[in-house]
Amino acid sequence: MAAHDDDMNRGIRPGRGSDDPSGQIAYLEQEIAVLRRKLADSPRHTRILEERIVELQTNLAGVSAQNERLANTLREARDQIVALKEEVDRLAQPPAGFGVFLTANEDGTADIFTGGRKLRVNVSPSVDLEELRRGQEVMLNEALNVVEAMEYESVGDIVTLKEILEDGERALVQGHTDEERVVRLAEPLLDITIRPGDALLLEPRSGYVYEVVPKSEVEELVLEEVPDIGYEQIGGLGNQIEMIRDAVELPYLYPDLFKEHELRPPKGVLLYGPPGCGKTLIAKAVANSLAKKVAEVTGQAQGKSFFLNIKGPELLNKYVGETERQIRLVFQRAREKASEGTPVIVFFDEMESLFRTRGSGVSSDVENTIVPQLLAEIDGVEGLQNVVVIGASNREDMIDPAILRPGRLDVKIKIERPDAEAAKDIFQKYLTERLPLHTDDLGEHGGSKATTVQSMIQTAVEHMYAESEENRFLEVTYANGDKEVLYFKDFNSGAMIENIVGRAKKMAIKDFLDKNQKGLRVSHLLQACVDEFKENEDLPNTTNPDDWARISGKKGERIVYIRTLITGKQGADTGRSIDTVANTGQYL
């Protein structure tokens, strides 16, 4: 259109020198018309251009977003390729091995043990050679160089320590099949005290032991503690307590006097007597008293002693040699404790169950090896101080004579059944003024608790020890035909007195709950005596009355017949024959 206008303009444009005004006017009018048309078309062109610009901007934004997405996709693809390459490289690497660090060398190398071989290898700069410890596990690369430090081994075999060798870095141990082996001590064991008998964790390939496993066979059979029982808590055994204190405490407290008089301290003490009369109680009080005496001598606030309470029947083992080994471990522990200057009591309760007379066995001859083992250990105590063996038994006639001879169990103390005076003393341990007493009983004695308690004890003891018709218990017939009537007092014990007081206390509690009458009464004690006697009516119910009589403290002529003289709770008939057996050695 512009070109057409230009042609038209050129066609109607007057010449340069034209003087025709009308022509010039026509030309100008045409110019004006053209300009007006151009002016009218200008907004439309502007709008078209603006729309085009917006369209181009929209296209540009879409292209930019697409370009960003492509860039992100490329980056993700690159990361995946890198990760896959690393995974491929990792999977293509040879496996890493493990070894045990032995020692570091001056040139920066290390000696290790791996694959059954001892090697000297290089150490990666990332590993601090000075931080590696004996027995520590290390990681190795394909060239068998140390590239990483690991932890100590935590699994392996259990072995028993026999002794530590002179260099302090090796030890002699024993495996479960009794084979002996020399092993190295890992760094953690060099800083702690280990003792023979401890269970250790062994890594068998490298020969290192790493830790003490909290499982010692001796601990399962030994109660290593100081009991809190004092002599003042034991009633009716004043003479026996004095004898055992002379045998146990004097040699420890006054060793110079014994040496001056050339007097050898006793190696052992045997406490024998019927059940429930205080044998175990005295043994526990010995350890407690020794601890207090140690404190007095040394000036310490609290003394220390050890009481190794051997659970005799649990010491027996069906495997040959196991019981003997356990006995050796027990005395090994005792020697170790005694070497520290601490008194040690090795207490064998129910001694006849372990150390029967050799040759008395029927189904086995285990005593033929157990007894010599104990004899060897007791004789070994001679060179040690502060170790005393105490045995307790109610069948001392079954213990091997070699154990009972002087020089082994030197002191033999019989723990008798309590008489009336001893029974009063025992009652006073359990029946005290601290207990609530019934107002009626207090009123009979002017409100005095002390007088009331003494009266209750006196009444109970008189009832227990009266040779009355109601206290008749047994009629025994001896082998020579003699007969004897035994009363309940003949079978009394400290344990029975404690049980009687316990019954009376329970009756007082029940009376308070039922009748709202608080306090212990003498009638409770008397009824408790009757109930206790009735519960013991089945005592002689055994196939061997002679063995039963020996355990109960009746020694002497052999008993062949027992007849009960008390009617049972269910009205059982009295007078039953009890047959004897030929072999009396296997009762226990």
Curated annotation (Swiss-Prot):
<dbReference type="InterPro" id="IPR041626">
    <property type="entry name" value="Prot_ATP_ID_OB_N"/>
</dbReference>
<feature type="region of interest" description="Docks into pockets in the proteasome alpha-ring">
    <location>
        <begin position="587"/>
        <end position="588"/>
    </location>
</feature>
<dbReference type="InterPro" id="IPR003593">
    <property type="entry name" value="AAA+_ATPase"/>
</dbReference>
<keyword id="KW-0143">Chaperone</keyword>
<comment type="similarity">
    <text>Belongs to the AAA ATPase family.</text>
</comment>
<feature type="region of interest" description="Disordered">
    <location>
        <begin position="1"/>
        <end position="23"/>
    </location>
</feature>
<dbReference type="GO" id="GO:0005524">
    <property type="term" value="F:ATP binding"/>
</dbReference>
<dbReference type="InterPro" id="IPR050168">
    <property type="entry name" value="AAA_ATPase_domain"/>
</dbReference>
<keyword id="KW-0175">Coiled coil</keyword>
<dbReference type="InterPro" id="IPR012340">
    <property type="entry name" value="NA-bd_OB-fold"/>
</dbReference>
<keyword id="KW-0067">ATP-binding</keyword>
<comment type="function">
    <text>ATPase which is responsible for recognizing, binding, unfolding and translocation of pupylated proteins into the bacterial 20S proteasome core particle. May be essential for opening the gate of the 20S proteasome via an interaction with its C-terminus, thereby allowing substrate entry and access to the site of proteolysis. Thus, the C-termini of the proteasomal ATPase may function like a 'key in a lock' to induce gate opening and therefore regulate proteolysis.</text>
</comment>
<feature type="coiled-coil region">
    <location>
        <begin position="47"/>
        <end position="94"/>
    </location>
</feature>
<dbReference type="InterPro" id="IPR032501">
    <property type="entry name" value="Prot_ATP_ID_OB_2nd"/>
</dbReference>
<comment type="pathway">
    <text>Protein degradation; proteasomal Pup-dependent pathway.</text>
</comment>
<dbReference type="InterPro" id="IPR003959">
    <property type="entry name" value="ATPase_AAA_core"/>
</dbReference>
<dbReference type="Pfam" id="PF16450">
    <property type="entry name" value="Prot_ATP_ID_OB_C"/>
</dbReference>
<dbReference type="GO" id="GO:0019941">
    <property type="term" value="P:modification-dependent protein catabolic process"/>
</dbReference>
<dbReference type="InterPro" id="IPR022482">
    <property type="entry name" value="Proteasome_ATPase"/>
</dbReference>
<keyword id="KW-0647">Proteasome</keyword>
<keyword id="KW-0547">Nucleotide-binding</keyword>
<dbReference type="InterPro" id="IPR027417">
    <property type="entry name" value="P-loop_NTPase"/>
</dbReference>
<dbReference type="Pfam" id="PF00004">
    <property type="entry name" value="AAA"/>
</dbReference>
<dbReference type="Pfam" id="PF17758">
    <property type="entry name" value="Prot_ATP_ID_OB_N"/>
</dbReference>
<comment type="subunit">
    <text>Homohexamer. Assembles into a hexameric ring structure that caps the 20S proteasome core. Strongly interacts with the prokaryotic ubiquitin-like protein Pup through a hydrophobic interface; the interacting region of ARC lies in its N-terminal coiled-coil domain. There is one Pup binding site per ARC hexamer ring. Upon ATP-binding, the C-terminus of ARC interacts with the alpha-rings of the proteasome core, possibly by binding to the intersubunit pockets.</text>
</comment>
<protein>
    <recommendedName>
        <fullName>Proteasome-associated ATPase</fullName>
    </recommendedName>
</protein>
<dbReference type="GO" id="GO:0000502">
    <property type="term" value="C:proteasome complex"/>
</dbReference>
<dbReference type="InterPro" id="IPR003960">
    <property type="entry name" value="ATPase_AAA_CS"/>
</dbReference>
<dbReference type="GO" id="GO:0010498">
    <property type="term" value="P:proteasomal protein catabolic process"/>
</dbReference>
<dbReference type="GO" id="GO:0016887">
    <property type="term" value="F:ATP hydrolysis activity"/>
</dbReference>
<feature type="compositionally biased region" description="Basic and acidic residues">
    <location>
        <begin position="1"/>
        <end position="10"/>
    </location>
</feature>
<feature type="binding site">
    <location>
        <begin position="276"/>
        <end position="281"/>
    </location>
    <ligand>
        <name>ATP</name>
    </ligand>
</feature>
